[in-house]
Amino acid sequence: MKILICNDDGYQAPGLVALYDALKDVAEVEVVAPEQNNSAKSNALTLHTPMYVCRASNGFRYINGTPADCVHIALTGLLGYRPDLVLAGINNGANMGDDTIYSGTVGAAMEGYLFGIPAIAFSQVEKNWSHLASAARKARDLVLQMSQQDLIGSSPWLLNVNIPNLTFDEIAHVKLCRLGRRHAAEAVITQVSPRGDTMYWIGAAGPAKDEAEGTDFHATSLGHIAMTPLKVDLTDHDSLGYWAQTAAKLTLA
């Protein structure tokens, strides 16, 4: 089994190292990750700035680009082979609900999916790296069990997986979930620069809004691993009929 691993926290992030260490003895693993933290870069590609591939002392390769750049370059010119699985993470903090729209971790996994490869985005729920080894072991077990079920190397699929920051034995079983929703993000943070200009920092993510039973928020709050299948199609299929009536009345020719 050949696995490509990326992340959005950067090639030196503990979560990336832990995921690699957990899988290196059971698969042929290659790491291609961003040089710097690229959180919230979603699916962004770098189109107007040259990028360079460098080799770290531990063998990881890193690129001065986004997570999606890293996977794109790896799959279209760097590796020289097609991996069986693309993994992203382990992210430092949750990617649940609306987070998935912004997440560079999900964006990296989605880039693999767009190239027809099964992909998983792994995240820990809290941002303190606590019990990271447990999360990495759970990620390893999930990958191995999926391999045993012949799901890897098959037709493409995309999964978002959030793992609670608990000990290995405290983490409950996997629950298949839908995405929840967050409230709108908190207000921007303003500061005055040494030159007197106003600086703006994006505020923290909003708290959970839809955390009902069946959501990723609910599952992880009970100690479960939340697993959500994702898709790329953003079409609102339920409202196509409504908008068809409106579109029929528009005269823009």
UniProtKB/Swiss-Prot annotation:
Its EC number is 3.1.3.5. Keywords: Cytoplasm, Hydrolase, Metal-binding, Nucleotide-binding. A divalent metal cation binds at D8, D9, S39, N91. GO terms for cellular component: cytoplasm. Coiled coil: none annotated. Its main location: cytoplasm. Its cofactor is a divalent metal cation. GO terms for molecular function: 3'-nucleotidase activity; 5'-nucleotidase activity; exopolyphosphatase activity; metal ion binding; nucleotide binding. Binds 1 divalent metal cation per subunit. It is an enzyme of class 3 (hydrolase). SUPFAM superfamilies: SurE-like. It holds the Pfam family SurE. It catalyses: a ribonucleoside 5'-phosphate + H2O = a ribonucleoside + phosphate. It is found in: Cytoplasm. InterPro entries: SurE (IPR030048), SurE-like_Pase/nucleotidase (IPR002828), SurE-like_sf (IPR036523). Belongs to the SurE nucleotidase family. NCBIfam families: PRK00346.1-3 (NF001489), PRK00346.1-4 (NF001490), surE (TIGR00087). Nucleotidase that shows phosphatase activity on nucleoside 5'-monophosphates. This is 5'-nucleotidase SurE. The gene is surE.
